[in-house]
Amino acid sequence: MRMTGPVERVLTAFLSDPAAPRYGYDLMKAARLPSGTLYPLLARLEQQKLVGSAWETPQQEGERPRKYYRLTGEGVRIARLELAQASARRQRAPARPGRPAPGSLG
């Protein structure tokens, strides 16, 4: 899995409560992603068997069904591993030099 910013944010949202089912709008808010980014990402995670999904039957007439997503057991394991590796890479990355102050020679 390629660990991009959106992937990292979605996995972090899932891992805040790994057993809890999450629906799309909930994940959009938690990960701060637009639907055009989130849903293709969820589809890829499903294809990789890291996320499972199920449709909820509306309880009242007129309610729209919701599709709930949940990390699989393997998804939890991979998400934790990938997030730990991403964190370690950030800690090892050399600090980026700052810009010199205006008028300085540096």
What are these regions (language model features)?
Residues 1-37:
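N-terminal helix-turn-helix DNA-binding core of bacterial DNA-binding proteins
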Residues 42-46:
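Short, hydrophobic-biased segments on the C-terminal half of alpha helices
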Residues 48-62:
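Beta-hairpin "wing" of winged helix-turn-helix
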Residues 55-57, 73, 97:
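Short alpha-helix boundary/capping motifs
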Residues 60-83:
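Basic, amphipathic "hinge/linker" alpha-helix immediately C-terminal to the N-terminal HTH DNA-binding motif
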Residues 77-106:
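Amphipathic alpha-helical dimerization/coiled-coil segments
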